[in-house]
Amino acid sequence: QGGLVTTAVGTVRAEMVVRATEAFTPSLPTLKRTLAPIYSLMIATEPLPDSFWAEAGLHERATFNDGRRMIIYGQRTADNRFAFGGRGTPYHFGSAIRPEFDQNPAVKELLHRTLRELFPAIGDAAITHHWGGAVAAARDWWCSAHYDPATGLASAGAYVGDGVGTTNLS
């Protein structure tokens, strides 16, 4: 209902209500088929020396991604770890989202292997962290933002992990 959100713990009234439920959108009965949750997983190394960052060409903290089948992305963290992620996890039937999907040993190994292929200077640096979560993909792969001034209802989503940085493109 426009201007009204009811939850298990109470009701909120507002002039505008924005639904930004991303990967959890399929849990809403009327929106079940609008977005598909896909998992993005990440690994992070132990802190790496400045010499690695210089050799890798990432000494100025550039971020990167590419468009291979397993979309990958990475960046240097504030404590000099290499945070590296990708989307090699399969879609789960019925748009299922479960905590156990946040980690996938096969994808973790694939990410580690890909990181070593792209940045051989990383050598045997230890992987100290591994995590993941669901992001939303529209079935046509187009992110969107909508607003209906008549009802005060708005929605935004399907940013496939690119998040707020791409909201101005919707």
What would you call each of these model-derived segments?
Residues 2-3, 11-51, 55-150:
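Active-site substrate-recognition segment that forms the wall
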Residues 94-102, 155-170:
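A conserved FAD-binding loop/helix module that cradles the flavin
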